[in-house]
Amino acid sequence: MKRSTQLGVVVAVLLIGASVWWFSRAQPGSIELLPEGAPTVDSGVASATGSGATRKTTGAVTIDGGLPEARTGGGVELARFGWGSGEGNLGRSRPDEANPEAPMSLTVDALGQVWILDQVNERLVKLDRNGKPLGTVPVPVQAAQDVVVTADGTALVMDRLVDKAIAVIGPDGKQKGELPILGKGLEEGGASTGLFADGKDVYVEREHGDSVKIGSTSGEANRDRPEVPGRPAGDGRTYLTANIVDGPSGVVMVTAIDRQPQQHRFTRQLVVGLPVLGLNALDADRSGVIYLGTIVELPGSTPELPQFGITLLCLDPLDGRPLGQTRLPANTSPEETFRELTVLPEGGVLYLERTEQGPRVVRYACGS
């Protein structure tokens, strides 16, 4: 790549402030941001050659030569907000001497209700499955970055940088407890790259590789802190990891491991067909279909006028073969976020899209 092109891509990456898995420290694991050394925003960047994603994934690698034709458009708006602190608004912060922020994360609970982490306004914003506001819940930690809601309505909110703890909030909105992040398996808060719940167990992903069980949804910490080989997926049956094999060539790889017994199911190498700068989603729906979000540089992009998008891939749960892909617009404003895409239990994703006028929640299907 010519130096002028490299500089152009570096500048462009600065604009993609919403990539879920970016932050300023490159560590071994399973996610890679290209170009190497580019300024980054929030969640963890990791090396594709690190051991975290491959230590327990021994097995054959299947290589795909291409993907189904991309579906474009077709998103259905669920809710729209303005920027601000009042009702119907979500917070945005653009300080002179710190990273700008927008809502860090969103998730969906067992009832289909949407929870948005509006940390600038120190609250969770709750919507029904049709996008109607249901109220807010105070956030009791100082630097919240991720949220997960369990089947019984317990909300888990992660602060990995200041309090370095997971706040456990009951269905009544009152805090039930707090789980420390630091301990066996997690020596630094910044190494935490995702928050996950599996039944009553609470896991924190380390450097996009293994996940550490830090406690339970009752607020009780786990002293032993055992590890599992990847992030617990939403199907209840799979651990997942992903990595970028060759960013400029658009080659990525996904590994699935069965939970019981803990054995390798597949490793699938996929050719996206466009340069890949980062990954911003990895999960499975209730049926087991796996979703991988890739941030790509679009055809016609130049150093002077870079153009980016998100290619959302859906993969077969048994062997990882591509079932379809959908092209989404990339968020290019400078705000930091942590999880801008969340997989719906019934299939498809919700995307927290940002504009200068305000953010909106959009539902997308994957493929045709």
Residue ranges and their predicted role:
Residues 4-368:
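Eukaryotic scaffold repeat domains enriched in small/polar residues
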